[in-house]
From Swiss-Prot:
Pfam family membership, one: DUF5401
One term of GO molecular function: type II site-specific deoxyribonuclease activity
Keywords: Endonuclease, Hydrolase, Magnesium, Nuclease, Restriction system
Source organism per UniProt: Paramecium bursaria Chlorella virus IL3A (PBCV-IL3A)
UniProt lineage: Viruses, Varidnaviria, Bamfordvirae, Nucleocytoviricota, Megaviricetes
Name of this chain's protein: Type II restriction enzyme CviJI
Catalytic activity from the UniProt record: Endonucleolytic cleavage of DNA to give specific double-stranded fragments with terminal 5'-phosphates
Length: 358
């Protein structure tokens, strides 16, 4: 009896232990399910958050894209309006120039010298604004000048009646590199323009004279070119008819001085112009500033990068006689040569028949 009771007691204890283990396993499984459910809940929450942030990002990007597109359309509309204004202004200038031309009392053949174009340029530009005004000059590449304040008018400099004097003659006879000056309310010249006619290409500088203002290695480069040229002249010291030669210019200083004046590198002035411009004036108003551009080629002071291709300055020599048919003489190294003229010209003057030297 005692043995049976003892066996039942042991089996009961085993059953209790097994039941306890079963309950513990059940509890563990429940906790595992709870943990997995929590992880899934967190994953779903994070996914929802990610989707919401993605939607927000897409919405912001779309909003930005729409804003940029609206801005682009507005800028395009503005550009079209400005282009229409520019074309209307050009047409207005053309009509004004025709009126000026038709109002002349003298009906003789129109001269091709630069003075006529400069005179008309001044008349046209002065009819386009009421001063005092602030101007900024803008060249063909979009380079902008300093602000020029209190401009009331533009005037033709009397020295510009000389077509293309050398710098030495400019100084000696008050004939400046500048053709046109901007005048402020005190009557003082405050900005300077070298103007070229719209048609054709004019020389940058005559260098036939013996009193050149170049110095140092620049002077030596000019003289070296001259010596090379005259060595090609016959013994009679008469330059052959219709013979032209040219040579590239190495020195950027020579180019800048030929184009902008011999005071290049100093303050703007009559012999250090702010801008060289070709053709008629165009004025565009933005805010309180008037931006002056040209219908043709233009370059701000020092911007040699504008002078490429047909505008590149080169040494150039040609045959030349006076209007009366008399021989024109040039002195090189104390020797006089007939019908010979030295220039710094745009490369446009060079043809297939022009001989390159040096």
């Amino acid at each position: 009896m005692d043995i049976r009771r003892k066996r039942f007691t042991i089996e009961g204890a085993k059953r209790i232990i097994l039941e306890k283990k079963r309950l513990e396993e059940k509890k563990r499984i429940a906790e595992e399910k709870k943990r997995i459910a929590l992880i899934e809940k967190q994953r779903i929450a994070e996914e929802k958050k990610r989707i919401a942030e993605e939607k927000k990002r897409f919405a912001l990007e779309e909003k930005k894209r729409i804003a940029e597109e609206k801005k682009r359309i507005a800028e395009e509309k503005k550009r079209i309006v400005e282009e229409k204004k520019r074309l209307a202004l050009i047409e207005k200038q053309r009509i004004a120039e025709e009126k000026i031309a038709s109002g002349r009392k003298i009906r003789k053949r129109i001269s091709t010298n630069a003075t006529k174009h400069e005179r008309e340029f001044v008349k046209v530009i002065n009819s386009m604004f009421v001063g005092p005004a602030t101007f900024v000059f803008v060249d063909i590449k979009g380079n902008k000048s300093r602000e020029i304040h209190n401009v009331v008018r533009f005037r033709q400099l009397q020295g510009s009646k000389a077509k293309s004097p050398t710098a030495y003659v400019d100084r000696e006879y008050n004939k400046p590199k500048a053709d046109i000056a901007a005048v402020d309310i005190t009557g003082k010249d405050v900005a300077w323009i070298s103007h070229k006619a719209s048609e054709g290409y004019q020389q940058y500088l005559k260098i036939s004279g013996k009193n050149l203002k170049f110095t140092g290695k620049e002077l030596e480069e000019v003289l070296s070119f001259k010596r090379k040229v005259v060595s090609m002249a016959p013994v009679s010291k008469i330059w052959p008819a219709n013979k032209t030669v040219w040579s590239p210019i190495k020195s950027n200083l020579i180019k800048n001085q030929a184009i902008f004046g011999f005071d290049y590198g100093k303050k703007p002035g009559r012999d250090n112009v702010d801008i060289i411009g070709q053709g008629r004036p165009i004025i565009t108003k933005r805010g309180s500033i008037l931006y002056l551009t040209f219908t043709g080629f233009s370059a701000l002071n020092g911007h040699l990068e504008n002078f490429t291709g047909k505008h590149e300055p080169v040494f150039y020599v040609r045959t030349e006689r006076s209007s009366s048919g008399r021989s024109i003489t040039t002195v090189v190294n104390g020797v006089t040569y007939k019908n010979l003229r030295f220039f710094i010209h745009p490369y446009n003057f060079v043809s297939s028949k022009t001989q390159r030297i040096m």
